[in-house]
Amino acid sequence: MTPPHILITGGAGAIGGQLVGQFRQHHPEARITLVDLNAEALALARDQHGAHAETCDLTDIDALPGWWQSLIDRRGPVDVLVNCAGIMDIISITGTGWERGKRLLDINFTAPMRLMELALPTMVEARNGCVINVASMAGRVPIRGCSYYGGAKAGIGLASEIARLDLKKQGVNVITVYPGPIHSGLESHARSQVKKGPVSRYIPTGKPEVLAERIYRTFRKGGARVIYPDIYALAKQVANLNLTNRAMDFFSPQPNQ
């Protein structure tokens, strides 16, 4: 039996790196491909986990099909696609600018959609496979300064949930992950963009290793979604959107710009 091919974007990041460890621990025979733009961090992750590394700019959407074909020619079809790459800025919509905004949309929404579209035909043909999309709680509730990021994560989250419905009878599972703040470079960068205060200082923040373990557990069980830290599951249960908006307006940190 051919070992599974697992592809993880953002594989050099905090969450992606922990996910690599989970998959390597439980599937020592797997062919793991890590994708990231940070070549130095990617090389470290590759060597640590015995993986294959691919440096790729996911914002170059038109180049993705050619890169994908080259990858599967060299490494074989992808059995598990983990869309974990992401960037975040907390800046008002008027302060973001289109170029920065487009980059947020491309990395957080367009690229994972394109990669799903490229990966799914062979999964459907084999009636076997899994896609894991890392969305965000910022795509579930309005957070000041996150028009582009929250919009992109809302898009990939909903698209992922719909894809699960589309594919559940075709042997392909789709998991949607909704993290709140997680200790990572992304979280540190975002925190640096907001005014200091009780909200930014004490907002519940999770551990990447715990999130990765929960994602893997959901993968093994064929589950649908992960919400972590647990307190953010409450936001999913709030039925009154007006109440949610008022609460988020009060609790959202204030962007510097």
Question: Model-found features: residue ranges?
Answer:
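Active-site helix of classical SDR
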Residues: 116, 152
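Conserved glycine-rich cofactor-binding loop
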Residues: 12-13
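Substrate-binding pocket helix/loop in short-chain dehydrogenase/reductase
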Residues: 92-93, 100-105
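Active-site loop immediately N-terminal to the catalytic Tyr-X3-Lys motif
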Residues: 94, 143-147
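Conserved NAD(P)H cofactor-binding loop of Rossmann-fold oxidoreductase domains
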Residues: 84-89
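SDR active-site lid
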Residues: 165, 169-230
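Residue(s) in the substrate-gating loop at a strand-loop-helix junction
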Residues: 136
